[in-house]
Amino acid sequence: ILSTSPDKEGVIQLDKETIGECMQKSILRYDDSSEHYDTISAFIKSLRGSDATAATYYLARMIDAGEDPKFIARRMVVFASEDIGLAGNGALSLAVATFEAVERVGLPEAKYNLFHCAIALARSQKSREITDLMNEAFALAHKYPNSPVPLHLRNAATKLMKDLGYGKDYKWQAGFQHEKGFLPEEVREESSNR
């Protein structure tokens, strides 16, 4: 700062480069929204690509830039279901525990939790099954929003409802497969064609 010349009014103007030189470390350019989104995108894509080294690099950059650690943890919670899903059911529990640790512990100590989770997510098997089934379910629900629930699946809370066939032939047991299935007929026909 002492080597910086003052302006016409005698004021020394400080910019990022000058401050960075004083701190003897680089300051991450994180001053616009595109850098924020580009970095989190690279982080998530590194997790998806099973590259723990790249994921931790982008994680360190975000932390150094002052990114909200809860934002990072939230993204890992979503990633655990979206990209790992049923291939690693423990991933969601780890990500949620990481979010809670970040909330309770805070930085700088929560860095350990964030890195632990990121490395584990990167090394986990990946599956898009949840995402694919969710998208299919919403597509069917949007196409058939008012298809009536089949009678055998309806709640038979009264004698009249039972007389109308509500809940008929339904058995309450694990793995019970009703001959008419569990979807409205028009939805069942389309879903079996997928």
Predicted regions and their residues:
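Terminal-proximal interaction/regulatory segments of ATP-powered molecular machines
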Residues: 49-54, 58-194
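Conserved C-terminal "switch" segment of AAA+ ATPases
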Residues: 4-14, 29-33, 83-90, 103-109
